[in-house]
């Protein structure tokens, strides 16, 4: 079965219980995930067979392990950036979006973020060891090179969960390039080329190894973009395209929304890519910490991405939690997370406004009733004690 050839309904049939458990918006979409994510899912499927309950439990345990790994990395990276680890964990790991969506919703971001953050920490530790080594030869500096290789492999694994994980390789590469430029007599372009070649080799080896181990082809490379068929109101580029299309219809020019969306979304991705290049060179110059560059670049990417779900912001919050110490960032994270926790369900779908109002009204009435009962009971108890 090729998960990149068709959606769950086409592959399993509309009557299959597993296919029916997939939300409608994804039921006909081929998988956009890489061999690491699908390989883990395949192992869970072999263990649980067709038991949905057992599979959900194992997938949730896997997500929890990814979040735990990310928590370890955030703690280490926060210490590296001279930031309070407790605050970083509070902003990232204890974020309600993390609990509701990464663990509750079992989204693959838990694995991706765990891999990429642990990988970044290992790469930076490897560079620290290389700086302390008297020589860069493999015979004397092998611990440092081993850590950078393992870190690059984990970041590559993150990209083979979701392709956005590959962004970490760029900032890991620039951190290594900066070290090579300062330590050796290499020119800037040569040190950048050497670091890029090193991590490109790690990437190719990792893709080959995971592809052979999982038996899953390279369909994930060309299968990206299926989610772009969804119009997400959190996407700035999509909002601009939809608003422009609506204005065109109001002016009697016809419905050209789809054509406009292709332009605005492409412009958004290009703008995010240009900003990312700027952050990469800022990292090379030492103006930006690699983790800060990764977090800020990912934040801009999420804002301008064609499709944005509420938990996508965690791509940026996790690395920024270990680096950003401005009060504005903390308050922005708290406000966004609090609002989005009440808007979208863990499975990624929203409820009708009437249903949401009914739920919150019922909760308010229930809480008010309990408070009144508690207040009356407290008054009665006080009266008896006084008597």
Specify the residue positions occupied by each region the protein language model found.
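Intramembrane catalytic core of multi-pass membrane enzymes that act on lipidic substrates
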Residues: 1-60
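Transmembrane alpha-helices of multi-pass, membrane-embedded glycan-processing enzymes
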Residues: 37, 41-45, 59-73, 112-115, ...
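Aromatic/glycine/proline-enriched transmembrane-helix motif characteristic
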Residues: 51, 63, 71, 80, ...
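Membrane-embedded helix bundles of polyisoprenyl
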Residues: 64-65, 77, 81, 85-127, ...
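Membrane-interface alpha helices of multi-pass inner-membrane proteins
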Residues: 99-103, 137-172, 296-303
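Transmembrane-embedded, aromatic-rich helix segments that form part
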Residues: 109, 113-115, 164-178, 312-315
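Perimembrane helix-loop-helix junctions
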Residues: 168-204
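Aromatic-enriched
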Residues: 233, 324-387
């Amino acid at each position: 079965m090729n998960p990149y050839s068709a959606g769950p309904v086409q592959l399993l049939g509309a009557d299959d219980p597993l296919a029916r458990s997939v939300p409608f918006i994804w039921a006909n979409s081929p998988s956009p995930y890489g061999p690491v994510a699908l390989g883990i899912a395949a192992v869970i499927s072999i263990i649980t067979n067709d038991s949905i309950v057992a599979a959900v439990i194992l997938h949730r345990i896997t997500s929890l392990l990814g979040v735990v790994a990310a928590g370890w990395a955030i703690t280490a990276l926060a210490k590296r950036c001279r930031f309070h680890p407790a605050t970083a964990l509070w902003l990232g790991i204890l974020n309600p979006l993390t609990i509701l969506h990464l663990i509750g919703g079992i989204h693959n971001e838990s694995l991706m973020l765990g891999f990429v953050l642990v990988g970044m920490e290992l790469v930076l530790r490897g560079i620290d060891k290389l700086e302390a080594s008297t020589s860069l030869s493999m015979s004397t500096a092998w611990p440092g090179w081993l850590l950078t290789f393992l870190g690059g492999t984990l970041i590559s694994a993150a990209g083979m969960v979701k392709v956005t994980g590959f962004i970490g390789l760029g900032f890991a590469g620039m951190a290594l390039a900066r070290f090579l430029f300062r330590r050796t007599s290499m020119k800037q372009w040569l040190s950048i080329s050497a670091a890029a070649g090193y991590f490109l080799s790690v990437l190719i080896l990792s893709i080959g190894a995971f592809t052979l181990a999982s038996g899953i082809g390279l369909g994930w490379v060309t299968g990206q973009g299926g989610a772009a068929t969804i119009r997400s109101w959190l996407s700035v580029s999509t909002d601009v395209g939809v608003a422009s299309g609506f204005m065109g219809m109001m002016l009697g020019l016809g419905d050209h929304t789809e054509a406009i969306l292709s332009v605005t979304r492409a412009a958004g991705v290009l703008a995010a890519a240009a900003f990312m290049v700027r952050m990469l060179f800022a990292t090379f110059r030492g103006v930006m910490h690699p983790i800060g560059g990764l977090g800020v670049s990912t934040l801009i990417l999420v804002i301008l991405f064609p499709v944005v779900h509420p938990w996508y912001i965690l791509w940026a919050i996790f690395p920024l939690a270990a680096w950003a110490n401005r009060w504005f960032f903390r308050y922005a994270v708290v406000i966004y997370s609090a609002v989005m926790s009440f808007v979208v369900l863990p499975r990624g779908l929203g409820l009708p406004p009437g249903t949401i109002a009914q739920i919150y009204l019922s909760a308010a009435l229930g809480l008010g009733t309990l408070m009144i009962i508690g207040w009356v009971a407290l008054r009665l108890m006080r009266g008896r004690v006084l008597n």
